[in-house]
């Protein structure tokens, strides 16, 4: 008997691509004016090349909240942080932009995909879980 597929059953890369396209098609996420000029962290030298980077980051963040839950802005700053190149000096870890993470979480919250957790951070809502699982089911059916 065939059962429904969840986000855990499909490739993360394929899911993020498909869910980012779904978010872009839905038109519920409104892009801020600064998306074409902002860097994603102080560790980066340039702004993202991909014009759809905001949707991809939102899809990735929704997937991470689905899988782990209880993630807040600080956790996403650590997750998307990386090594800052300091020229001739040794590299060091730097957190990513908190404003980008906060704005995406607020957008996902207005779309009713994530909600505030009483223990701190964000958790996935039932409608958000259903939405993510539907996209995962379409990916599994296509394979």
From Swiss-Prot:
Keywords: Ribonucleoprotein, Ribosomal protein. This is Small ribosomal subunit protein eS19x. Belongs to the eukaryotic ribosomal protein eS19 family. Pfam families: Ribosomal_S19e (PF01090). GO terms for molecular function: mRNA binding; structural constituent of ribosome. GO terms for biological process: translation. One of its GO terms (cellular component) is plastid. The keyword Ribonucleoprotein applies. The keyword NADP does not apply. It comes from Arabidopsis thaliana (Mouse-ear cress).
